[in-house]
Curated annotation (Swiss-Prot):
Recorded metabolic or biological pathway in which this protein acts: Pyrimidine metabolism; dUMP biosynthesis; dUMP from dCTP (dUTP route): step 2/2
Coiled coil: none
Top-level lineage group: Bacteria
UniProt protein name: Deoxyuridine 5'-triphosphate nucleotidohydrolase
Alphabetical keyword list: Hydrolase, Magnesium, Metal-binding, Nucleotide metabolism
EC number(s) given by UniProt: 3.6.1.23
Gene: dut
Protein purpose: This enzyme is involved in nucleotide metabolism: it produces dUMP, the immediate precursor of thymidine nucleotides and it decreases the intracellular concentration of dUTP so that uracil cannot be incorporated into DNA.
Length: 157
């Protein structure tokens, strides 16, 4: 785990009752971009995610994100590679003015049932700046060498 610099913005966190005893989001290494989020399911329950199905997993956390920032919810690569478990709506955006519980929308793209247990690391949260540009409607935009080419137009090799 790493310590934030004194000039870093503060991410306020309320831990709800069903998340008591779970670790708060934390950076696992000095170079980590994302903090792991944990499943706040009841101790005596688990969520069984069937192949091809999706579910909303509670984290038991409410975030107070400073204006000018967002928190992005992203998949954990190990869950995706080993089990076919990933986040839908990726990256999910938690806006600075949202004050509800953070939940993670997971889908099982694997072949087997997947059990989500209390405290399991289910996703990553990435704290990121937000820039809101001025919107200006135009009749024309500048030309580029690429033009309107997309979806493989630059090749696949």
């Amino acid at each position: 785990m790493t310590a934030a610099s004194s000039s870093a913005p503060t991410l306020g966190i309320i831990r709800l009752e069903h998340a008591k005893g779970l670790d708060l989001p934390a950076y696992e290494t000095a170079g980590s971009a994302g903090m792991d989020l944990r499943a706040a399911v009841a101790e005596d329950r688990q969520i069984v995610l069937l192949p091809g199905r999706r579910t909303l997993v509670p984290t038991g956390l409410i975030l107070e994100i400073p204006q000018g920032y967002e928190v992005q919810i992203r998949p954990r690569s190990g869950l995706a590679f080993k089990n076919g478990i990933t986040c839908l709506n990726t990256p999910g955006t938690i806006d600075s003015d949202y004050r509800g519980e953070v939940k993670v929308l997971l889908i099982n793209l694997g072949d087997d049932d997947f059990r989500i247990e209390r405290g399991m690391r289910i996703a990553q949260a990435v704290f990121a700046p937000v820039i809101q540009p001025k919107i200006e409607e135009r009749a024309k935009i500048s030309e580029t060498a690429r033009g309107a080419g997309g979806f493989g137009s630059t090749g696949t090799a």
